[in-house]
Amino acid sequence: MQCIETNNLQQLLEQVKPYTKKGKLATYIPELGNANPDDLGIAIFHKETEYIHAGNSQTLFTLQSISKVITLALALLDRGEEYVFSKVGMEPTGDPFNSIIKLETTSPSKPLNPMINAGALAITSMLAGKDNEEKMERILHFVREITDNPTINYSSKVANSELETAYLNRSLCYYMKQNGIIDCDIEELMDLYTRQCAVEVNCIDLARIGLIFAMDGYDPYKKKQIIPKHITKICKTFMVTCGMYNESGEFAIRVGIPAKSGVAGGIFGCVKGEMGIGIFGPALDANGNSIAGFKILELLSAQEGWSIF
């Protein structure tokens, strides 16, 4: 596959930049409302030539829903497929990511998949560790290993901002506790979940996460398997079917690669056996995806022939 060059990325960002004006920040999490809606950055981490980047590629932002892929991988390592999927389903949903509707109307009453908030909260409740400090340290260690960046941490400011306003997520937790999906203390779970969502990365870190998943869990630079192949396969399948909120189907048609977005404006994607892509653009479309980030990936995929379909 032909290697993309930095000047191509810079030209692409200039071409797509006007799209940022069409999006809006995720102001329902107060701290995310402080981002610059004009920011736009990209990094591509290749299996052989390291990375290229352009724009606001070194600006820190929080993982938010991108962390759901990380914790799913950890929960599968900790508990195994049988247990994880006895509590959380495997099917996409046409409802908003924070909806309670399917929990009430689906039988058995379990979240449809790990990429919606209810499913992600159930997944986080499964993580091994004696307390939240140990569990959070495991999440951070995992992200640091995948990114090869030992400085990665979480933003307590963003975590606290989310914790103070997470009324709907608390509702999801109480409903799941009533139905035996989770059995832990709700406030402790909310504390851990908001911290996991507040892990800070930049586009280069995100692209390296994408590379590890593109290589089926193998790190071509450290020459070692970081995540078992079968676990990355499960994660990438969910990324295709549910990774871009209610635009997952359209994204599959227009871009056609496994990807996961977050409401801080991040998107990471993977091109199998080749590279990972990390994008930051906090101006979001109506579905909660980076509006310019989606367009960048659409143009790159068409240009480079990335689609898996």
Swiss-Prot record:
Entry keyword set: Hydrolase
Quaternary organization: Homotetramer.
Reactions performed catalytically: L-glutamine + H2O = L-glutamate + NH4(+)
Protein's UniProt name: Glutaminase 1
Annotated source species: Bacillus anthracis
Tree of life domain: Bacteria
One BP annotation, GO: glutamine catabolic process
Gene Ontology MF, one: glutaminase activity
PANTHER family noted in UniProt: GLUTAMINASE (PTHR12544:SF29)
Enzyme Commission designation: 3.5.1.2
Positions of substrate binding: 65, 117, 162, 169, 193, 245, 263
